[in-house]
Amino acid sequence: MVLMKIINLILFLLVTVQINAQDILSLKERARVIEEIQKDRFDNLLPKLMEETGIDMWVIITREYNEDPIIKTLLPPTWLNARRRTILAFYYDKDEKNLEKVAIARYSFGKNIPSIWNKDEEPDQMKALVKFIEEKNPIKIGLNYSDHFALADGIVKTDYDLLLDNMSNSLSKKVVSAEELAVRWIETRTEKEMIIYDQLVEITHGIINEAFSTKVITPGVTTTNDVVWWMREKVKKLGLKTWFHPTIDVQRNEVSDLYAFDGESKFDIILPGDLIHCDFGISYLTLNTDCQELAYVLKPDETEAPDYLVKALDEGNRVQDIFTDLFEHKKTGNQILKEA
């Protein structure tokens, strides 16, 4: 049996590109790279985002076991979670083009963000934060609360209330939602990250390639669930993580296997003539991938995928191009659909 990747029309043979554990950085090396990524983002990205969103102070307050989603993008590689109550404050001086990063916490926040909290001078952590804010006298104080984006809605009510209770009335009037800043911080990749991301995508496709090969799939024997758990095991052996459970489903001439991620696959055993679809991603070096691919299982008398599948892929790719050609800044998805 040979599998055919419809996505780029390459026949899979027994010889496949395999991603091995030695291609993955050690935990120690990963820590070094993550620190470099974070420093690059602090130095080159955050000042730009704060200036463009008009927030000159961004305060992130989070607690152990109940972390703000944004804090997970900032955690030093030696920190697996926040510690007790962790407070970070970023102040951008637009005139001086300078970003000050501080932690109002018991410890420095890794190598990039020093702690400035002197408990002997001010034992109350929240009062120490307010003192720092007053010294900087920002125009806008951004906090992570949002009606629309969960990733930008990380501050809990108790911390929000505690902060405002310690602020003067004039200072509390400066508090605004950091929604736009938080979302842009999450969605924006630096040049350094994009170079690394290419490697993540290569690793992801390598795992899919191996999963869609005769090393893993024997038609008439292997189930879609077998492939799913092979992928999970492969990721574990490589020392990586998945950030969502993989999906493997089958499309046939009969009713397609569209179970919408909420049930068991109707087509359990993979057979010749099946079109296999996967949705799979990994987490590595603070980045996530999310890749989907198709593979066609050749019938015994076939050497290539049927013409109708090849044409269907071409049409699907054409639709993708139509959509992407209409992408414009601040244009909504519904607007693009209407124009397409």
Positions of the model-derived regions?
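Bacterial Sec-dependent N-terminal signal peptides
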Residues: 1-22
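Active-site neighborhoods and metal-handling regions in enzymes and metal-associated proteins
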Residues: 22-340
